[in-house]
């Protein structure tokens, strides 16, 4: 999918055809990730409830959460959504293979992992499709957002700032990045190999000055 300033209409129709709860004229939030509490699903559901309480017809899609062995966790999330009045605006789905299409369908991507991640692949994938990202400013996610899209970085676990940041970004989405060349697979492989060569050269100099 090309980088675009707005969700892809065909991708949005595809998402709604699979999950009617994702239909509607309001914004679609995407939180991809495994079915574990470390991924921030509860915070995303609470965010959805606050957004909808303002009158916004927001929807939340969480692909990857519904996995084998995660039944009790998913049931707890569904109960929270029900008590928060957002069960009909939430889709807790199994992993999907067409994740780029899911990014393209969304208005905004969330990265709310409670445990700092070493890299934060979701940030790169979403920005590569032109979708804005909001996430906790820690670990690799925080570093990538600070470099590539600073307005999306939120102090870790500050749910009030999360709410304000998401509202602002939905109202005024940042323009897609002109290029992501530094984060293509080839570019990152080349950078890693260059680092290995430098380390090997330093080691040779230390052994044979």
Predicted regions and their residues:
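Conserved donor-binding/catalytic core segment of Leloir-type glycosyltransferases
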Residues: 21-39, 45-48, 61
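Glycosyltransferase donor-sugar binding loop
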Residues: 32, 59-75
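Nucleotide-activated donor-binding/catalytic signature segment of Leloir-type glycosyltransferases, i.e.
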Residues: 74-94
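Short alpha-helical donor nucleotide-sugar binding micro-motif in glycosyltransferases
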Residues: 95-96, 102-106, 121
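Acidic donor-binding loop of glycosyltransferase active sites
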Residues: 104-118
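Short hydrophobic beta-strand element within catalytic cores of glycosyltransferases
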Residues: 132-135
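Conserved acidic donor-binding segment of nucleotide-sugar-dependent glycosyltransferases
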Residues: 147-160, 167-172
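A charged, aromatic-enriched C-terminal amphipathic alpha-helix characteristic of glycosyltransferases
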Residues: 171-205
